[in-house]
Curated annotation (Swiss-Prot):
Protein name, as recorded: Envelope glycoprotein
Gene: GP
Skewed-composition ranges (Low complexity): 337-347, 389-424
Summary of the function given for this chain in its UniProt record: GP1 is responsible for binding to the receptor(s) on target cells. Interacts with CD209/DC-SIGN and CLEC4M/DC-SIGNR which act as cofactors for virus entry into the host cell. Binding to CD209 and CLEC4M, which are respectively found on dendritic cells (DCs), and on endothelial cells of liver sinusoids and lymph node sinuses, facilitate infection of macrophages and endothelial cells. These interactions not only facilitate virus cell entry, but also allow capture of viral particles by DCs and subsequent transmission to susceptible cells without DCs infection (trans infection). GP2 acts as a class I viral fusion protein. Under the current model, the protein has at least 3 conformational states: pre-fusion native state, pre-hairpin intermediate state, and post-fusion hairpin state. During viral and target cell membrane fusion, the coiled coil regions (heptad repeats) assume a trimer-of-hairpins structure, positioning the fusion peptide in close proximity to the C-terminal region of the ectodomain. The formation of this structure appears to drive apposition and subsequent fusion of viral and target cell membranes.
Intervals, Cytoplasmic compartment: 670-681
Lineage: Viruses, Riboviria, Orthornavirae, Negarnaviricota, Haploviricotina
Amino acid sequence: MKTTCLLISLILIQGVKTLPILEIASNIQPQNVDSVCSGTLQKTEDVHLMGFTLSGQKVADSPLEASKRWAFRAGVPPKNVEYTEGEEAKTCYNISVTDPSGKSLLLDPPTNIRDYPKCKTIHHIQGQNPHAQGIALHLWGAFFLYDRIASTTMYRGKVFTEGNIAAMIVNKTVHKMIFSRQGQGYRHMNLTSTNKYWTSSNGTQTNDTGCFGTLQEYNSTKNQTCAPSKKPLPLPTAHPEVKLTSTSTDATKLNTTDPNSDDEDLTTSGSGSGEQEPYTTSDAATKQGLSSTMPPTPSPQPSTPQQGGNNTNHSQGVVTEPGKTNTTAQPSMPPHNTTTISTNNTSKHNLSTPSVPIQNATNYNTQSTAPENEQTSAPSKTTLLPTENPTTAKSTNSTKSPTTTVPNTTNKYSTSPSPTPNSTAQHLVYFRRKRNILWREGDMFPFLDGLINAPIDFDPVPNTKTIFDESSSSGASAEEDQHASPNISLTLSYFPKVNENTAHSGENENDCDAELRIWSVQEDDLAAGLSWIPFFGPGIEGLYTAGLIKNQNNLVCRLRRLANQTAKSLELLLRVTTEERTFSLINRHAIDFLLARWGGTCKVLGPDCCIGIEDLSRNISEQIDQIKKDEQKEGTGWGLGGKWWTSDWGVLTNLGILLLLSIAVLIALSCICRIFTKYIG
């Protein structure tokens, strides 16, 4: 009887501690699974901001039921790229992240911002984008969007150009899972409501039967079990409690989480849904019509765990992949005698892997060498190099195999970073200017730490010119630059190409004649007088006419040059003001976050906070386009077009006809007078 009561009590306590989120089907024995499904958030450092930039063009075919999802807003200079937006979540969940005392760690959305999203959603970016090639943001998290007008509404038939500067708040453990290839297998989710997920179609990867890639419909009636991973990896246990409440009419609550299930690389009570995948290129390879929409800036991407002779050797890290862009606030980890991976790559950015200490990991001295050809290697045995973009795969093949030394770690993992006197270890801190802010009563939420500290890097894409270039400090070493904070890239398309073969186009200074002849009054009178001299006058008049034509062409050329320079100046000014407007909105959001517990910005400032930043970029763009159209219109020839009686020659012909008629009338009158004189006389 006592044993039964004890078991019932333990079951009740376990039911209180674990949070029902989802059900995971696994073939792995319970003793091989590290129980990471429970836990509470101890400090806000465990919640990190992951920012990224979306760009491109999309046409909204139908209005969305909810406006809390990604959108693209017109009115700013569009990028000249093709873009395909991925999954648009049909069900939106409210989310709450609380500390152990039950206090919410997510601030309420500002009241003066329309359609401010705070929901669980599913998004995927196809093509050559930061999260391209099958990596889906399918984790439970709070999504906070900052676009150019603080609005995420999409309207019917509207072409949305330009992207959003987005931020997603996730748990640190989940954040680490997104950019680390920890498990080769995947888990099966049983959701009570109809959902969409991504399945990979790449057959070259082993154990690649999983749940990302091509968009497919999924509901609880389907019974697809993904291949589990061979060995779970131990993870930190500091995770936020997540409570999901569906706001959609067809959404219901989620099933109970089994703490003994296969969840080695997921913190379901944190903010993740659990799916992880190896880096594949199947989705991007099948999208032939897509082109790159992002500048080539370093981006954390998944990496493969080392699996040597025994299953206890694991390394966990973040690989910065060239050709990808992702503004991510990476957690600061205390490195211990770690080394980095350095490869000779033809891409702009070298691959680097800051190693992260792992819980319950001891005596890691195994070295793993990545093969030169990723497709012919076994991913479960070696550390794979990230696959490049399909458009740059030929020029970015690795020429040297990197060697990774797995660090020695202790059997415990601390969630708070500790300063290390070792200079090499300091280089492995992902954010050099990462503020070490722990949760204390009365402290502000450092959610915007990564976005505020991230440098702005305008890295141009093809057919693009930039006017700003704020790179990292000159004193930073090359190794430190590899681990620099990710950049927020804001690159706008610049002045379009104009036909340079057009005569007197005014595109550059050499098109127009340097000498502009101004004829004086005396010269005009002299030319007019000399033109009446027989034989000599027509020659003088011809030279005079040739000079006038040359001057006219030169004036037209200079006017075109002035129009081109004016249009370029207006575009540069529009670009600067657009970026300033964007950064002003971001700063306003940050101020709203900081002043939220005192009632918001408007409560502190009063009526002075109601300042609207009007977006007149579309009007300016239309004026620039009109200037370009006007200056590109050419009127060549002698005006022979149109109706003959309204052209220049038509007027002369009419005058000639009138003159001939007058002469004929005079001759006729003269003849009539002679006839009358003859008969009368």
